[in-house]
UniProtKB/Swiss-Prot annotation:
Gene that specifies this protein: NPR3
Extent of Basic and acidic residues compositional bias: 37-52
Biased composition (Low complexity): 61-72, 123-133
InterPro entries noted in UniProt: HTH_NPRL3, Npr3
Bias kind Acidic residues: ranges: 75-84
Protein name (record): Nitrogen permease regulator 3
Tagged with keyword Signal: yes
Length: 940
């Protein structure tokens, strides 16, 4: 179990929708056979053996027709060799597979007649996913004659015709084209399916045509004419008929070439050896189980998602009740446009959007948005097509983006929870929002279904392609060119499996960034043999994750009644920010992932340009104030108001600037652009990190790959080239690290030859920390009180006549069983124990007195006591602490009272210097004055 390594465990992504005619798999990626061949080799062998034998024509596969629909509420006729093999291929037995959702289509009979007239060379579509599956299999058969395609026997066809249930199956072809060896020998049907056939007495002609059949089967045969030669205009004509400009869409970076290799590619009608109909029904829970977490495990795969269902009024999301604008709000809105200081400012967040003006129609259904969104996108030019998509908008009542994962059992909960929290919920909710506003999801599903049907039936290039892998790749290229939603899902999958951040532009309406945060910082040294980490991880007590997990009040600054900001002891503004990449590249990414016209984005980009790791973030408050002042001045000039200009002049150092900088910093840290560190200084001490990337050939190479066999350099030598390119005048990287790694750690300033080299060496220091080679050695302090201080305080209390020392100790020791002091360091004498034991013989009245005297003795006889939290110390403990500094100079006593709360072993002194603006020499003098009362610890 490697929980410290980033691993999404994602194997596929499936988009399903559900209508009155049943669920439908609209799109899935990648179309591969086995997701985890290397780790589950035992199961892969048997499955691959069945696939290879099926492709060679030696035996029909039971999985090919496990859950295929054959018309009106009937599963397809399988060519199965045994019942157990069927269970392994589909995940459910025949009796457990529901057929209530089957698509009742009238276009199937016409398609079958066309197929028979053409001699089995083509295959038509059925409503639902079987349309695409049937078309592709028949086309592949015409292209590759070496593959034997199983089909039902004639007796079963006669049975279907007698029951008026003639339909087009995904694996049905003309009998003349089938090999004689499998023409009718292996065509079998279970008793359960036969009972379903015989009991279904409904006439197919009485069924109303489904939305999918109208959408995919209502094609004009003269729109695209097939030619005798293959040319590039085939794809362009098909796509231009859907929407202008689709043929020019670049998808070169989306499709993985290895997915469409003959050894890995699987039929598009299959999803990891499961039939598409089975997965569609699996991912379509009832309404009561929608709009909440969906998690279902089948075999070794986990289906995770958030199915979105319409409510009773037909809306995809609840509408917020608009409050009437009161006079108070109107006055505040017209007072110069100054934002409320108490509100949290959202700066460059992943959900930041620039929306178009929504429709004012609030009739309660998603249909009013269809006409507007359709006219804006320009994709529905044909009135008949517009009617079909409008019918689909009204018919679809659920959509589900389901993520298929295969985590190990020992890390199942962690991987599943991370995927659901960071990816599934955010993507599903943003799709629900855009579907409710503009009908985007259903509109894109209509594009995918129409493109798939046209390509399978009318594409000459697809028919001329040899092999299922080439045909599947061509089909996916067409789908990705036609649908922006398919491109977004594919891009999301490719980025997540590579542990990258993905930025999706949803219908030019919303920009969303998704990622699963990686674990690359540790406060304690992990066991690398049991649980390895990424090469170059950061080893420090200042964890960036602690800032991201802070509540909103601490992140944005807690507000006091007077309107001032009450800073937390661990305020992020006291730290510096170290960029993890080159500044131009970060700015380019920020401009791409957000809207450039946003004021927050402008401030963030200007802040990134001026960031230095040697300066605390609080120093950039004037920069933010100047940018806000310039913006308010422009607004005042445009509005012709002097009141806004006066507000701009008084905008320095307000809570708004503090909140904006905090939000920008947390944004940059969360999206891996920067790290929060203490400001770099030549007076600080830095050491070579135990997690420095010395070994391995890559960041995730935790197995120490043999570099000779792989022909790769070690990480340190790869970084050596970068180091020499950036700092050509300095020694090599190993030599520089050896000069830092000395027996006794020294300040970094000992390496700087002169003041002229200060900036250069600080740049080197920032580079080494960025790549994980160095970590800062921090100083932590506790205060300890010895026996002499306790006796002196006891004498003072007796002279003051407050109370006896024993009574104070007894009360505080009883009330604080888990007190603020460390455990005593010496055991009591045996004589005291014997004395206490003998006193218990005089009766119950003396038991309590004996226990009190024992407690007093234990407390007085301890050599010293360490105060763990001076900030929350009791009155007696504070007397002890101030007694330690009593005979020191007045300035030292004042400094001690100022910094005593930081002597808790948790706050480094290097941070205290910045927070309280105290010189390092003054702190050293104070530590020297305290002398034996200080416990000092050097740690990262």
């Amino acid at each position: 179990m490697y929980t410290n390594l980033p691993k999404a465990c994602l194997t596929g992504i499936v988009l399903t929708i559900s209508t009155h005619s049943g669920p439908q798999v609209v799109y899935h990626y990648p179309p591969v056979k086995q997701p985890v061949e290397a780790r589950r080799g035992r199961k892969v062998d048997s499955r691959n053996e069945r696939v290879r034998s099926w492709q060679a024509g030696r035996m029909p596969s039971a999985a090919s027709g496990a859950v295929d629909a054959v018309g009106e509420g009937v599963d397809g006729l399988e060519e199965e060799s045994s019942e157990s093999e069927l269970d392994r291929s589909s995940g459910l037995s025949e009796s457990e597979v529901s057929t209530d959702w089957a698509d009742y289509s009238m276009s199937s009979s016409d398609s079958e007649s066309e197929m028979r007239e053409d001699g089995g060379g083509e295959s038509s579509a059925v409503g639902g996913s079987s349309a695409a599956e049937g078309g592709e299999e028949s086309l592949a058969e015409g292209a590759d004659s070496s593959i034997a395609w199983p089909g039902p026997s004639e007796s079963y066809n006669q049975l279907l015709e007698s029951q008026s249930m003639v339909g087009s199956s995904a694996n049905v072809a003309a009998a003349s084209t089938k090999p004689k060896s499998i023409k009718s020998r292996h065509s079998q049907i279970s008793a359960n399916k036969l009972f379903q056939y015989l009991t279904n007495t409904s006439d197919a002609d009485s069924r109303r045509q489904s939305v999918f059949s109208k959408l995919t089967g209502n094609e004009d045969s003269e729109t695209i004419r097939l030619t005798d030669s293959v040319n590039l205009l085939d794809l362009e004509s098909l796509l231009e008929d859907l929407e202008p400009g689709l043929a020019d869409v670049d998808i070169s970076e989306l499709l993985d070439v290895e997915v469409f290799q003959p050894g890995r590619f699987q039929d598009v009608s299959k999803i990891f050896n499961f039939d598409a109909e089975f997965v569609a029904e699996l991912c379509s829970p009832p309404k009561e189980m929608c709009n909440t977490r969906f998690e279902l495990t089948v075999d070794d795969l986990c289906f995770l998602g958030l199915p979105i269902h319409v409510d009773e009024s037909g809306r995809w999301r609840k509408q917020k009740v608009k409050r009437q604008q009161t006079n108070t709000r109107s006055k505040r809105s017209s007072s110069g446009g100054k934002p409320d200081a108490g509100s949290r400012t959202s700066v460059g967040l992943p959900h930041g959007t620039q929306e178009r003006q929504p429709s004012t129609d609030q009739s309660g259904s998603g249909a009013p948005y269809l006409a507007q969104s359709s006219s804006e996108s320009g994709q529905l030019r044909d009135p008949e097509q517009s009617d079909d998509v409008e019918d689909l908008q009204k018919a679809v009542h659920m959509f589900h983006v389901c993520f298929i994962m295969n985590p190990q059992l020992v890390e199942y909960n962690e991987r599943i929870d991370d995927m659901y929290h960071y990816i599934v919920t955010r993507l599903s909710l943003i799709l629900r929002y855009i579907q409710d506003k503009k009908g985007y999801v259903v509109r894109e599903c209509a594009k995918i279904l129409k493109t798939r049907d046209r390509i399978l039936k009318k594409s000459l290039k697809l028919k001329k392609s040899h092999g299922q892998a080439l045909q599947g790749r061509y089909l996916y290229e067409c789908i990705l060119k036609s649908s922006s939603l398919a491109r977004a899902l594919t891009k999301c999958f490719n980025s997540i499996i590579n542990n990258e951040i993905v930025t999706l532009d949803i219908d030019n309406h919303k920009v969303i960034s998704l990622q699963i945060p990686i674990k690359n910082e540790f406060s304690s040294l992990p066991d690398l043999k049991i649980n390895p980490v990424l090469r170059g991880s950061y080893l420090t007590s200042l964890l960036n994750d602690s800032f991201l997990k802070q509540p909103v009040d601490f992140a944005a600054g807690s507000m006091m009644p007077g309107g001032d900001v009450m800073h937390d002891d661990n305020d992020v503004l006291d730290y510096a920010l170290l960029l993890l990449d080159d500044t131009p590249k970060i700015i380019k990414d920020l401009e791409f992932s957000s809207f450039g016209s946003d004021l927050a984005n402008v401030i963030m980009i200007n802040l990134v340009k001026n960031l230095k790791p040697t300066v605390s973030l609080r120093s950039y408050l004037p920069l933010v104030s100047n940018l806000l002042e310039a913006n308010l001045s422009l607004s005042a000039r445009a509005a012709g108001s002097r009141h806004a200009a006066s507000n701009a002049a008084d905008s320095h150092s307000t809570p708004l600037q503090h909140s904006m900088i905090r939000s920008i910093v947390l944004h940059l840290v969360y999206w891996r652009y920067a790290r929060i560190i203490l400001p770099l200084s030549s007076k600080n001490t830095y050491i070579v990190s135990p997690l420095a990337p010395i070994r391995g050939t890559a960041a995730d190479d935790f197995e120490n790959t043999d570099m000779v066999k792989q022909g790769c350099k070690a990480l340190i030598y790869q970084h050596q080239d970068l180091f020499h390119e950036k700092f050509p005048t300095l020694p090599t990287l190993p030599s520089f690290l050896s000069s830092i790694s000395t027996c006794k750690p020294r300040s970094f300033g000992h390496l700087i030859p002169s003041k002229d080299h200060n900036l250069l060496y600080l740049s080197v220091l920032a580079w080494l920390i960025r790549y994980g080679y160095l970590t800062q050695l921090l100083t932590f302090v506790w205060l300890r009180v010895d026996r002499r201080i306790k006796i002196a305080v006891d004498e003072d209390l007796e002279r003051e006549g407050v109370r006896t020392w024993n009574s104070i100790v007894k009360k505080e020791h009883r009330q604080n069983p888990h007190d603020n002091v460390a455990a005593p360091t010496r055991e009591p004498a045996s004589s005291a124990i014997d004395e206490t034991a003998s006193s218990s013989e005089h009766g119950d009245a003396n038991i309590s007195d004996g226990q009190e005297s024992l407690d007093d003795y234990l407390f007085k006889e301890s050599d010293y006591t360490i105060i763990l939290e001076p900030k929350t110390a009791t009155a007696l403990e504070k007397r002890w602490l101030f007694k330690c500094i009593e005979n020191q100079p007045t300035e030292m006593q004042l400094l001690f009272r100022k910094v005593i709360k930081y002597f808790n072993g948790k706050t480094p002194l290097e941070l205290v210097e910045i927070k309280e603006n105290i010189p390092k020499q003054e702190l050293k003098k104070l530590i020297a004055c305290l002398d034996k009362y200080v416990v000092e610890l050097k740690h990262w």
